[in-house]
């Protein structure tokens, strides 16, 4: 129950305050409460957690890289806060989840709670954008308005992995009730994601659609239908206007031109600091001497590329660890699709689609490196492993 509440509260990292000198969030307090309850229950019933799993070694490597990144960061206090929020607590939550998700029923509760979180951010943000469209106050050249998060991209980054999992459940779950719940979530979340006008989010949605089509025996027809549907959506006036800025390289609102400059400056910085990057929270300061105009350098916290994000924050060691985690997620999902109990199997194509969508979206954005996204990521890995962990004595994959 505590784990489900924590999943439902993932967007609540925006609710912040201090307990004495210690800054915290509602999400962090929920994570800590879940861990305390788990520890008490473990000691009470003298359970022995299973630490060894396909994600243990890459998780330890990621933690090691993060600890080094704290040491090399220009602001150790800020870096320690990010280490705690993006690495230590989500990874600890992962180990809690793989112990408590001992049945598909429990896993479904966690997924349902993530769905509640997704709907909670989808409806108000979509309503605000629709109101702006209705009053003709939306400027497609600029970021869409948001309610809960600071940017519309943050909404898309949170929703896209959940849309991937929900799409798989809607397609493969044999029970009608499960399909209806997943479809109901998609009916709300997909339009909300489109209304963020996030170009990276659109790429992620396209990857999910193509991936689902490729998994069907009529893949050629469905891939063609997916591409036609994507083209039709891209011609909706506000979306077409938003995308139009990206094909005009002379347009001052073309974000790809700015991204290219940012990536170039980042690569120059990494050429000089290949092992450790800029350290956790150190990207702004690290990138400043490398030719990026001052106003852009002040606004950018990450290089907006999934490879460069991990490299600049946690060094080459962290990049290797993050890539290892993604590979392990796909490997576990493939095994789960073949070997897990039938009730778990519809989850696994969704895990693969979520990883693919994250990578595609991450070509131009910042997946993982936020409080909610890191918890969502590790919860997804926990769900993937739990289906194999609890299938019976034969589940001893290392």
What do the PLM-derived regions correspond to, one by one?
Residues 21-30, 82-86, 147-160, 311-315, ...:
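Membrane-interface micro-motifs in multi-pass membrane enzymes
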Residues 2-9, 333-364, 384:
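Loop-to-helix entry and N-terminal half of a specific, functionally important transmembrane alpha helix
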Residues 11-19, 72, 136-148, 296-309:
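Juxtamembrane membrane-water interface segments that cap and precede transmembrane helices
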């Amino acid at each position: 129950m505590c784990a489900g509440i924590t999943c439902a509260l993932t967007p609540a990292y925006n609710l912040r305050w201090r307990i004495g000198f210690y800054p915290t969030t509602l999400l962090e307090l929920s994570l800590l409460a879940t861990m305390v309850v788990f520890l008490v229950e473990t000691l009470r019933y003298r359970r022995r957690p299973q630490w060894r799993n396909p994600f243990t070694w890459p998780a330890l490597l990621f933690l090691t890289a993060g600890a080094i990144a704290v040491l090399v960061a220009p602001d150790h206090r800020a870096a320690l806060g990010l280490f705690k929020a993006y690495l230590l607590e989500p990874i600890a939550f992962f180990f809690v989840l793989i112990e408590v998700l001992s049945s598909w029923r429990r896993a479904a509760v966690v997924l349902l709670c993530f769905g509640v979180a997704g709907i909670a951010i989808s409806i108000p943000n979509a309503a605000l954008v629709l109101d702006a469209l209705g009053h003709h106050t939306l400027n497609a050249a600029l970021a869409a308005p948001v309610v809960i998060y600071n940017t519309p991209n943050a909404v898309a980054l949170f929703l896209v992995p959940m849309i991937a999992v929900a799409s798989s459940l809607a397609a493969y779950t044999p029970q009608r009730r499960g399909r209806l719940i997943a479809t109901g979530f998609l009916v709300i979340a997909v339009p909300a994601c489109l209304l963020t006008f996030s170009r990276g989010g659109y790429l992620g949605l396209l990857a999910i659609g193509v991936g689902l089509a490729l998994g069907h025996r009529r893949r050629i027809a469905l891939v063609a239908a997916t591409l036609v549907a994507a083209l039709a959506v891209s011609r909706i006036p506000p979306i077409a206007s938003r995308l139009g800025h990206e094909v005009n390289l002379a347009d001052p609102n073309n974000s790809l031109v700015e991204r290219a400059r940012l990536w170039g400056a980042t690569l120059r910085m990494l050429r000089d600091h290949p092992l450790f990057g800029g350290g956790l929270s150190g990207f702004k300061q690290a990138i400043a001497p490398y030719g990026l105009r001052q106003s852009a350098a002040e606004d950018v916290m990450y290089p907006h590329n999934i490879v460069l994000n991990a490299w600049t924050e946690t060094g080459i060691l962290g990049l290797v660890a993050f890539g290892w985690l993604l590979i392990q997620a796909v490997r576990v999902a493939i095994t789960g699709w073949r070997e897990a109990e039938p009730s778990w199997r519809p989850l696994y194509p969704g895990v693969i689609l979520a990883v693919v969508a994250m990578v595609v979206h991450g070509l131009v954005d910042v997946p993982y490196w936020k409080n909610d996204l890191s918890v969502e990521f590790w919860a997804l890995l926990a769900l993937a492993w739990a289906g194999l962990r609890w299938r019976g004595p034969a589940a001893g994959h290392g």
